[in-house]
Amino acid sequence: MRFLKSLFLISFLCSFLWSNGQSPIQLAQQHYDAGRYDQCIAAASVAIGEEAGAEAYFCRANAHHKLGHFSEALEDYDRARIHGFSDDELYLHRGICKISLMMYEAARIDLMQHLELKPEEAPTYYWLATLEYMNMENKASLRYLEETLAIDSAYADAYYLRAANMAEMNRNNLALEDFQLALEYNPKLLRAKFNAAVLLIGMGQFENAIELLSELQLENPDFISEVLYYRGEALYYMHDMEGACTDWKESAQLGDRDAQQNLKKVCGEKGKLKSKKRTYFAF
């Protein structure tokens, strides 16, 4: 299905380019900058085979990466390198892609290469911190985050990752502060507010957690089933079974398996709650 869609887009683009005098690589980059990643892939595919082949592979790789096509992205990053793409950003982008594919040691090689070439760029340190976090090396992750924030003190994702590290080290007050900073620097990073609420539940501050989760419900994020699950959990600990079961029912209808289990075991059979496993680094 993806192939047929791409074939249609390529046919359309060929006629469009013929009439507008734009090069395929120019159009591909325009589509990428505008967030039209499928169209970018189609235009870059037309550009491959022309003089801009190496650049087109890199552009197509970036679009695949944005769409979550990590294997296709890595293949195109490698093709870009083979065809002579020499921009230092290749190492950073390919390293990030390898992290997404859990190729951590290979990712480290690319990121360290980029760090050697561009030692003053905050994203390189941030992604090395991400790699260490994925390897459960919290202290090493925090060291890279110190470097990240020394270069860019407004790097919202770095505060978010530092908060995740702190939470896993049970330094909850510091984690709460960093989730708040992440949200201040990027108000769209609603996962920061969500994770703060989850932490507050673990700290027994149920009313504060419910307040944050109720705000999130109104903001209707794409993880609303999790919001409802955890608000149900907070209500359960406050002995509001009716409220808890209402939230779990709605969460279950949205596909949350833990909510489905709670409806059966806690609301139906009056058993004890088995809390959902906490994770703090999802975006």
Question: Where would I find each of the regions flagged by the language model?
Answer:
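Structural marker of alpha-solenoid helical repeat scaffolds
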Residues: G49-E50, H83, L117, I151, ...
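Terminal, low-structured helical/coil segments at or just beyond the last alpha-helical repeat
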Residues: Y229, E233-F283
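N-terminal leader/linker segments that initiate helical-solenoid repeat arrays
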Residues: W18-E55, C59, K66-G68, E75, ...
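Structural signature of tandem alpha-helical TPR/SEL1-like repeats
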Residues: G35-A42, L67-R79, L101-Q113, N135-E147, ...
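Alpha-helical adaptor scaffolds
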Residues: D157, L161-E168, E177, L190-E207, ...
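Helix-start (N-cap) detector for alpha-helical repeat units in TPR-like alpha-solenoids
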Residues: A54-E55, D87-E89, A122-P123, A156-D157, ...
